A protein has these predicted regions:
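Conserved C-terminal helix/tail region of periplasmic/extracytoplasmic solute-binding proteins
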Residues: 107-140
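A general structural signal for well-ordered alpha-helical packing
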Residues: 10-14, 39, 52, 56
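Ligand-binding pocket segment of bilobal, Venus flytrap-like solute-binding proteins
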Residues: 1-29
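Mature extracytoplasmic/periplasmic domains
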Residues: 34, 43-111
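Tryptophan-centered motif/residue detector
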Residues: 8-9, 36, 130, 134
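Periplasmic-binding protein-like
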Residues: 20-44
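Sec/Tat-exported extracytoplasmic proteins
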Residues: 2, 10, 17-18, 44, ...
């Protein structure tokens, strides 16, 4: 079948589909979109905090970021210039697909220009606020 548009759930799914041969693209509307971030943390009282710390240090290094950007099931955007440079050197086709080439229009330009906005940290909304939001969302 064909799909003209669908609600975005992340460029990672587009990357997975594209790599499988699907002719799809992620596009940020001119009106803008939301950017979310994920983080790694070490739980209080962790029995292996030293190993977790080493893993976080690796995955946030340029080499780890390139590995993460090239993952088959969950390719992610790289948050560091050195990571972008290494990705362009090692897998230029993936750097281009993800819009992480420094000498071309890229995702960072969209963030700077306000086209992509960071999702704000959650606040404790009332159940009524959530229900109102959900009703508005469903009716859109």
């Amino acid at each position: 079948g064909q799909m003209l548009a669908m609600a975005g759930i992340g460029d990672w799914i587009t990357g997975t589909l594209e790599r499988s041969g699907a002719k799809v693209r992620s596009v940020i509307p001119e009106e803008g979109g939301l950017q979310f971030t994920e983080s790694f943390s070490i739980g209080k009282g962790s029995q292996k905090a030293d190993l977790a710390r080493k893993w976080i240090q690796y995955i946030t290094s340029p080499k780890g970021q390139v590995k993460s950007a090239n993952m088959a099931a969950y390719p992610c955007l790289i948050p560091s210039r050195k990571g972008w440079e290494l990705l362009a050197k090692e897998t230029p086709e993936e750097a281009k697909r993800q819009g992480m080439l420094l000498n071309e229009s890229n995702v960072m330009d969209m963030i700077r220009n306000g086209r992509i906005k960071y999702r704000q940290l959650p606040v404790q909304q009332s159940l009524e606020d959530w229900n109102d939001f959900w009703s508005e969302y469903k009716g859109a």
